[in-house]
Each structure stands twice: as structure tokens, then as C-alpha cells.
Amino acid sequence: MESGSNSTSCPMAFAGDNSDGPMCPMMMMMPPIMTSHQHHGHDHQHQQQEHDGYAYQSHHQQSSSLFLQSLAPPQGTKNKVASSSSPSSCAPAYSLMEIHHNEIVAGGINPCSSSSSSASVKAKIMAHPHYHRLLAAYVNCQKVGAPPEVVARLEEACSSAAAAAASMGPTGCLGEDPGLDQFMEAYCEMLVKYEQELSKPFKEAMVFLQRVECQFKSLSLSSPSSFSGYGETAIDRNNNGSSEEEVDMNNEFVDPQAEDRELKGQLLRKYSGYLGSLKQEFMKKRKKGKLPKEARQQLLDWWSRHYKWPYPSEQQKLALAESTGLDQKQINNWFINQRKRHWKPSEDMQFVVMDATHPHHYFMDNVLGNPFPMDHISSTML
């Protein structure tokens, strides 16, 4: 290991969707490599200290449900682990312990001490004073853009992990293990930067969305002339054209339900005239179907009483229209269809129809003044 500066920057990257739940891993790069200004003669001791720092990270993953998972390999070991199998989306891509294990094996160092000290390393990480800070920083990263139910599960998992750490015994003190202190401090700072970089574009997107919504609403309310004509009666009836509809451009958050109600009111005021005309057209089309049951029954009663000569006069048609609520055209069509389907004049009536001057049949009183339709004439009459 070469000596260098302690302030080494590290790029940040995430993968996965926070909406999948609190257990979904967070992809991260390697933490800042901890270096020392010690003499080159102590390289082996410094390498062992760095190895312990990475071992703290690996066993911290096993101690809590909030894993710092899916860690990408450092740049120097990328080729060494290229042949490893690809993990699933919710499993670590590379374990720091495995990466460092490969480095140690490649350098001829015995890795047995790292595996035998796993329990003590885990206990040291969970007992470190910065453990709660590390959990909180990780949860804050996962909270960015997450739905409320996921945020609640994250907070619950963080509380459970903190309680598990507290149950293991008293916490340690800073300075007992400088390597662990440096490791925890570096990761906490990294996660805080992650959270800041994630929050910035999310907040900018929310502000942009709210600005566009306000512009759309201002455009819809800035042209009252478009509401004139067919929309004026609706405005007077609803009495909603007040200053309460003005848009506050400084509001950061807008109630979605309030926007829906406002949009519904605007559409009703603007298109109420069209809606009324459409309703009338639908009613007309509905009237073209079957006649109402009560009106049809009245027409059948009249038909049964005048079955011998079912030709109502104009006065009778007007009376039927008034009693049934139908118009005269509907009554005429009903009688025409009824006669075609259910009435055939008798032989005597056929003679009367052909001899319009017959003086003895009282049914012909109105025939000369108002000739009846020819729909009832059968083939025998021709």
C-alpha cells in the first residue's frame, strides 16, 4: 500500500427501485480507501488494518436487516472477480470480504484469521458509537422518492436493527479501534453525500412538475371569454366564478383532490350547454323505441272499443295524445302498424269502404271530409 491523502473521493451509484421495499439492496461503490502517512516499513501492518476495516463492513451486512448490499469491486480487483457468477437483484454483487480474500490469497497471505474473527468483528461494528448514524444514513438514502408505506417499513426495520444492536451490550468508545472509527466515519459521510445527491434531482423534478401544473391552471383561468355563450348560464347557476379559483403560484404542494374538483367544475361550466343538448338527443332516441307501457295500454283500450273501425278522427287523436303524452305522429304510426298486423275488415266493412256514399253506416260520417289512409285496403278490395 502506498501512502497518500486521507480525503479520497468516491463516485456514487445506485440500482434498484426503492418502491420494492426496505429489503431491496443499494448498489454502492467501494468506500474511500483508508491510507496512512506511516513509513513504508509498516505496509504489512497497514494492509492488515485495511483488511479488518473491510471485514467490519462485511459482518455489518450480516448483523442487520438493512444491508449495505451489492457492493461493486474496487478498480484494482475488477479483473480478479470477473469470472464470478452474476447474483440476483436482491443479493450482494460482490462481498467486500470475498474481494479482500482474493487479494490476500493472491498476495500469499493466510486468510484464516479473518474467518475466525467474524463474530468479534460483527460485535464491534454493532457496538460502535457510529452504528446508529450509519443505519440512519442508509435509511435516508432509501427514503428518497419512496412511497409512504415503504418509508414506514424502512423506519421500522431501522428501529429493529438499532434495538438489536442495543441488546448486544454497552457501546464502545471512539479511539479504541482507529481503523474501525475511520471506516465508520467514511461510510457515514459517503451515505450522507448519496442522500444529498439523490434528493437534489428529486426535489427539482417536483418543483418543475408543480410549476407546469400552475401554468396549465393559469392558462385555463386566464381566458374568461372562452366561457361566454354556452357556458354563461352554467356559471350563473353554479355561482362558482369567484376569486377562490385563482392559482397561487407560490404554493409548493397542491392537493390532488382539490385540483380534480376544480377541473370538474371548469369542465361543467364550459360544456354544460353541450351536455344539455346531448341529453335531449339521447331522450329523443329513447323515445323512438317502444312506447311507454301506460300509453300503449290506453291505445289498446281505444283499439278494443273501436275494433270494427279503428280509424280515430283528428279530435280523437288529439285526445289520445293529451292523455298518453305522445305526439300525433307517434299515435298515427301506432295505429298504422296495429291495423297492418292485427286488423282485417269484414266483408260488410269492405263493401262500406268501397261505397263511400253508403247512407246507412254511421262509421262513414267523417270519411268524406278526412279520407282514411289506404294501409287497411286488402287484396280483396282491389
From Swiss-Prot:
DNA-binding region range list = 283-346
DNA-binding as a keyword of this entry, yes or no, is yes
- Principal localization? nucleus
Tissue specificity, in the record's words, reads: Expressed in all four types of shoot apical meristems (SAM) i.e. in vegetative, axillary, inflorescence and floral.
Q: Which GO terms describe its biological process?
A: carpel development; cytokinin biosynthetic process; floral meristem determinacy; plasmodesmata-mediated intercellular transport; regulation of meristem structural organization; stem cell population maintenance
Function noted in UniProt: Required for shoot apical meristem (SAM) formation during embryogenesis. Negatively regulates ASYMMETRIC LEAVES1 (AS1) and ASYMMETRIC LEAVES2 (AS2 or LBD6). Probably binds to the DNA sequence 5'-TGAC-3'. Binds to RNA.
Protein name (record): Homeobox protein SHOOT MERISTEMLESS
